[in-house]
Amino acid sequence: MKRKILIYLKYTFYCVLIIIIVCIGLLFYSGNSVKYNRNYGINSDSLAGEGPYIVYQHDQVRQVYLKGSKAEGYALDEKIVQDSVVEVHVNYYPDQSSFKVQLPIYKHYMPEAAVYPEPEKLLVISDIEGGFAAFRSLLIANGVMNETYGWTFGKGHVALAGDFVDRGYFVTQVLYLIFHLEQQALQAGGKVHYILGNHEIMNMQGDHSYAVGKYAYAATLLGIQQAQLYAGDR
């Protein structure tokens, strides 16, 4: 009886080992293209429509989008900004949705208060990590905004407790949505608080070990270092 059990375990071990080897082989055969994606399985490495990046350079302000494709190559679609407020269009290309942001060209930054009165309602979110689709769904489900990106939280406050960058493929869109909601919340008497997490600080200090490769490519196309994507003049 013991001998039969040992034989059974032996063959089970070899079967499992063969399955593991075949799976690893399939991954390499597919060009290592299988990857975890927090945006519902959408291939989101593309830089098409990425941006806009607002770049202060030589006393000029440039508004830059990236256009093109992996097959044809990428190029910059840019213009010089003359106004003190720029209307930018932010695209989430997997489902072709977009929203507009009125972006002031800041010359001075005012520090935020550290203490606020208790709001009538409060939502705390953290660790979105560039997952735009999940962030959008969470905000809609909790009544913070509607499906057209309009603030619906009244005088409520939303506290963003860090780590909204890194790992995901749509960090730019996430950051613009935060800024968009900050503006709308103020108009309604509400407030969005963005507290830096360790991943925001890592990026600003030049540690991009958790960032996806597309942002290194974006910085190269813009002619800047990756850390400068989040600099005070971007």
Regions found by a protein language model. Give the residues of each.
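Feature recognizes metal-dependent phosphohydrolase scaffolds
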Residues: 2-234
